[in-house]
Amino acid sequence: MLIALGAVGYSSHAQATDEIQVYNAGIAAVGQLTVQQHLNYVGIGQKDPPFPGGFPSNHSLNGTPEFAYGMTDWWELGLYLPFAVQDRQFLSDAFKLRTLFVSPNADKRNLFYGINFELSYEMPKFAQTRWGLEIRPIIGVRNADYEFIVNPIVDVGFGRYGEADFAPAARVARKLKDDVYVGLEYYADFGKIGAFSPLAEQQHTLFAVTDFKVGDVDIDFGVGYGLTRASDRLVVKTIIGYAFPVPGTKDSSERASASGPINPMAHLSARSTPY
């Protein structure tokens, strides 16, 4: 989801860079398992902790394996196991569970939509609240050459330090040929809903991205630049994904679009949290 770890001053949580995607409503086929590995490196990031006891994002490697399973042609379940590596120290951020509802066959529609609910349990170095909820609407349009997708995300933290933040993400991309896209992705965190942070303390990051396939493997690569003081200045993101064959078929050709939660990726376009 983008979210650069760290902010000016203290906030209740450090928005993690474990998953940087814009969801495009693509899901796994019924009975299909997909696996993605997210890896994101903060080359130039925040050097101060986002809250007392938190860890700064500078020179950190963040990621998560993502497992998704298609329940129906409009419903998918997913599991994440986020982590970070910094100064040769491995830090686990527990787990996230998600349930995604979409318009069926979203990868074949000119207008597509959906909504994702993601429940997370986070460790003390990553957040001051243990439990959180992400609500991510998905709205997109595409034609033969272009696609435009918006995820107006609301991140909710529960407990004493909890708050609801507005953290939208968006993507515009052009299709160069089958399974090859280039474009821009934008991730932000405006802060608490009803009391947005000053601009300098908001997170706004712009990524140049490309999605392509190597055999049956989907690859998403992007380089992001932070536009405000509170944003990580330089972030490199990658997603490597594979959709297992649907039971009863001979190959893995029956894969949904991916890039949304990027799951069965027809083309790996989008998802993100802010980041």
Model-identified regions with their sequence ranges:
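Sec-dependent N-terminal signal peptides
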Residues: M1-G6
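Transmembrane beta-barrel domains of Gram-negative outer membranes and organellar outer membranes
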Residues: A14-Y275
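N-terminal signal peptide c-region/cleavage motif recognized by signal peptidases
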Residues: G9-S11
